[in-house]
Every structure is written in C-alpha cells, then in structure tokens.
C-alpha cells in the first residue's frame, strides 16, 4: 500500500503443501514507514486518473517507493558471513532453502563459511531489489553467485547494479556471462527446477576454483 503497487507471490508445492503453527497476531511485526518524497495526492488510485499520470507515477515514484520500503524494513538480509568476505551467494524463497541444504551437503555451516570468506544474502523482495542494501552487502566481494531458477529476475538486477564495476564478477545462469551458451558453463538453468544436490555440485566446483 505504501507504493501503490500490486504484490505478487510465487508459490511452490515444496512450501504451500506444508502445515505449520504460526503466530497470527497482527502486531507481531513492526513495519517502518520510510522517508520518501511523495507526489501530490500520493501513489494510490484516485478518481479522474489518466493513463499518462498513472504511467508517470509508476516510472518516477512507485518502484523507488517499493525499494525504499524494502530497505527500511530490512526485507533482504545478510544471513551468514560478515564484511570482508570474498564470495557472496544470493537467493530467495525456495532457492534460499536449497542453498542452505546445499551448503550442509558440502559440510559448510555458518562458522565454516565465515572462515572461508563466504557470505549469504537472503532476498525477501525480488523486485525491485533493495539496491542500497545489496551494495552494502556486496562491498568488498570478488564474486557474487545468484542461485535462481526459471527467469533470471534477481541476476539481471544485480548485473545492472554492478554494470560499471570491473572488479566484481557475477555468476548465475551461466558462469561469467549473460545469455547464450557461448558465455561459459551453464550453472543454474532456466528450465526445470533446481535441487540442493545440483546447487552443491556447482557451488563446490566454484569454491575449489576460487
């Protein structure tokens, strides 16, 4: 509601076909309203709204409002590792759980990851990505690995954020490139689903090389 945008959720059988006891208290979360320069009338729907004005608000304000809300409420978090790490792994949703499982298959826990110079970033809002939070996490990294199945929404935003950075590499769909097999080994395909064993095999190979 803060940004006036629709919110979409990608659901998977691995999570929706499960049961759990949850806390339904509406006050269990304390949301922060960020400082943001709103246009006249705010960002939500109103009477006598023209397509031109709707488009202008979308492009000039709404994406940035959603990003500001994400940053203020820390939807994306550094989970493992600390500043000074050299390898960063970013993932969201089920892929985040798969990464944790994959790390356990490699016998790497939080302490071992810190010793090896590895940091993990859990993304709660995949678009728009909290660029300020991402840059804070990625500072000093030599390599960012994006574990993401299907369409590469997070990877594209990260590569855009680091476009002019010649020191940091980004691996995702492919190893060291964009679309197309000529850009290197395929790591995390856009077809099918990823699983912890596949991810562990790819991450293990990268860790050995690095």
What feature does the model see in each segment?
Residues 1-210:
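Flexible, low-complexity linker and terminal segments
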């Amino acid at each position: 509601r803060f940004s006036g945008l629709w919110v979409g959720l990608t659901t998977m059988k691995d999570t929706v076909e499960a049961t759990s006891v949850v806390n339904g208290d509406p006050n269990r979360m304390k949301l922060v309203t960020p400082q943001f320069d709103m246009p006249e009338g705010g960002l939500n729907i109103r009477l006598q709204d023209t397509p031109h004005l709707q488009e202008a608000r979308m492009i000039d304000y709404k994406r940035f409002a959603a990003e500001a809300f994400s940053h203020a409420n820390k939807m994306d978090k550094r989970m493992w590792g600390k500043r000074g790490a050299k390898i960063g792994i970013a993932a969201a949703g089920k892929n985040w759980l798969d990464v944790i499982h994959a790390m356990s298959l490699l016998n790497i826990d939080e302490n071992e990851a810190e010793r090896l110079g590895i940091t993990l970033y859990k993304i709660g809002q995949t678009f728009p990505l909290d660029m300020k939070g991402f840059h804070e996490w990625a500072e000093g990294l030599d390599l960012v690995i994006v574990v993401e199945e299907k369409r590469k929404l997070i990877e594209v935003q990260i590569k855009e954020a680091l476009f002019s950075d010649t020191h940091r590499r980004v691996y995702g769909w492919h190893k060291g490139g964009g679309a197309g097999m000529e850009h290197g080994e395929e790591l995390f395909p856009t077809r099918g689903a990823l699983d912890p064993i596949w991810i562990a095999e790819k991450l293990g190979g990268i860790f050995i090389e690095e």
